[in-house]
Amino acid sequence: MAETKKMIILKSSDGESFEIEEAVAVKSQTIKHMIEDDCADNGIPLPNVTGAILAKVIEYCKKHVEAAAEAGGDKDFYGSAENDELKNWDSEFVKVDQPTLFDLILAANYLNIGGLLDLTCKAVADQMRGKTPEQMRAHFNIKNDYTPEEEAEVRNENKWAFE
């Protein structure tokens, strides 16, 4: 007899519902705690996550659950070809526009999905690598609200960062 998998319903801020396996849902510590506290019977509302972003989060969690299952608890998984495939998948996953990437960071933080938070924050850090403060401001559309004097003072106090 086939084992039936427990399903969980997640409800996005814009009213979309997603029915997913509990094993995928518990990649989120936030959702895991709600399930443990018996708060999942009528679906779990996620008021801080839109349907589009939740779909991406679910895609990430599902891929990582499947990869772990395929590895079968193999301790050498993290040095294996399968892990290289997952790393490649992850690097493609974060090749999204900037607003989506930032929304994924917020969702990963809200849902407490450490791997996704690390991945998305690393993607932003990689975008910053090698850029001057001016280039970063332009890239992230950040207004410089320092006076020239204040900026010179900050640069002087933090010379090590500009070497």
Curated annotation (Swiss-Prot):
SMART domains per UniProt: Skp1 (SM00512)
Disulfide bond residue pairs: none
Pfam family, any one: Skp1
Key words of the record: Nucleus, Ubl conjugation pathway
Signal sequence annotation: none
Alphabetical list of Gene3D superfamilies matching this protein: Potassium Channel Kv1.1, Chain A
Pathway membership: Protein modification; protein ubiquitination
GO terms under cellular component: cytoplasm; nucleolus; nucleus; SCF ubiquitin ligase complex
Residue segments, region Interaction with the F-box domain of F-box proteins: 105-163
GO biological process: auxin-activated signaling pathway; jasmonic acid mediated signaling pathway; protein ubiquitination; response to auxin; response to jasmonic acid; ubiquitin-dependent protein catabolic process
Cellular compartments annotated: Nucleus
Record carries keyword Signal: no
Tissue distribution of the protein: Mostly expressed in inflorescence and siliques, and, to a lower extent, in seedlings, roots, and stems.
Subunit field text: Part of a SCF (SKP1-cullin-F-box) protein ligase complex. Interacts with At1g56610, At1g67340, At3g62230, At3g59000, At4g27050, At1g55000, SKIP16 and SKIP32.
Name used for this protein in its record: SKP1-like protein 4
Organism listed in the record: Arabidopsis thaliana (Mouse-ear cress)
Primary gene name: ASK4
